[in-house]
């Protein structure tokens, strides 16, 4: 059975940088954002439902769905956001399970930004959190997505708090400005998770306390 490490963190925390680092050393990465993107773009039934629900306001000139506009639109409406989540999340989870099952590396990295919000923490054997100060998240989100300060603040307010994410995580990388030692992080955690994977596949149990934290600051 595949040993699953869930990578999570708030918006603009640096999850992609870390997941790409693991990918470069051969770890299978299952990214729910990429899965969601593929479902929206390639599942005709899903794309038709979204277009019918939200109309032209979330479309590009070529009639394809603009995911950034879609995200901004649903964040402003609780009912629309729930509708979209109910449409996408079951499909995202099913595809995640399929990709995890096909894993070839010693362990796999399951990238789930909404791990805590969707109460999926028990679906992974270990949780790695990328933790970032809220002010830094807002600044990065405004710069990356070209949205206003208030829009970025609203998105972050809808996510779980840093305190909640930290309380549920096993390992933490604190990313305030940049990853100066990213290769060290990747090297260390690959050794740790490969070791835990071997123990798990041999005994099916690992006697490490849930709140045993490995922190990198």
UniProtKB/Swiss-Prot annotation:
Principal localization reads: cytoplasm
Per UniProt, which keywords does this protein have? ATP-binding, Coenzyme A biosynthesis, Cytoplasm, Kinase, Nucleotide-binding, Transferase
Q: Which superkingdom, per the lineage?
A: Bacteria
Q: Residues in domain DPCK? A: 4-203
Q: Which residues bind ATP?
A: 12-17
What pathway is this protein a component of?
Cofactor biosynthesis; coenzyme A biosynthesis; CoA from (R)-pantothenate: step 5/5
| Catalytic activity, EC | 2.7.1.24
Q: Name one GO cellular component term.
A: cytoplasm
Gene Ontology BP term (one): coenzyme A biosynthetic process
Question: What reaction does this catalyse?
Answer: 3'-dephospho-CoA + ATP = ADP + CoA + H(+)
Main EC class of this protein? transferase
Q: Where in the cell is it found?
A: Cytoplasm
Briefly state the protein's biological role: Catalyzes the phosphorylation of the 3'-hydroxyl group of dephosphocoenzyme A to form coenzyme A.
Q: Which PANTHER family match?
A: BIFUNCTIONAL COENZYME A SYNTHASE-RELATED, DEPHOSPHO-COA KINASE-RELATED
| UniProt similarity note | Belongs to the CoaE family.
Name it.
Answer: Dephospho-CoA kinase
List the gene name. Answer: coaE
């Amino acid at each position: 059975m595949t040993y699953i490490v869930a990578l999570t963190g708030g918006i603009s925390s640096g999850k992609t940088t870390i997941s790409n680092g693991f990918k470069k050393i051969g770890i299978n990465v299952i990214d729910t954002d990429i899965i969601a993107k593929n479902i929206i773009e390639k599942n005709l039934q899903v794309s038709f439902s979204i277009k019918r629900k939200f109309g032209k306001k979330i479309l590009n000139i070529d009639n394809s769905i603009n995911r950034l506009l879609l995200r901004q639109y649903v964040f402003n409406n609780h009912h629309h956001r729930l509708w979209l989540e109910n449409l996408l999340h079951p499909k995202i989870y099913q595809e995640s399970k399929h990709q995890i099952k096909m894993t070839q590396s010693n362990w796999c990295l399951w990238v789930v930004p909404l791990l805590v919000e969707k109460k999926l923490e028990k679906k992974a054997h270990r949780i790695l959190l990328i933790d970032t100060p809220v002010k830094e998240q807002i600044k990065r989100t405004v710069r990356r997505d070209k949205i206003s300060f208030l829009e970025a603040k609203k998105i972050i307010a809808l996510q779980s708090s840093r305190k909640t994410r930290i309380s549920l995580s096993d390992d933490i990388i604190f990313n305030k400005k940049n990853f100066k030692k990213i290769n060290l992080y990747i090297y260390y955690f690959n050794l740790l998770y490969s070791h835990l994977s071997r123990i798990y596949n041999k005994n099916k149990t690992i006697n490490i306390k849930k709140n045993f934290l490995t922190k990198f600051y």
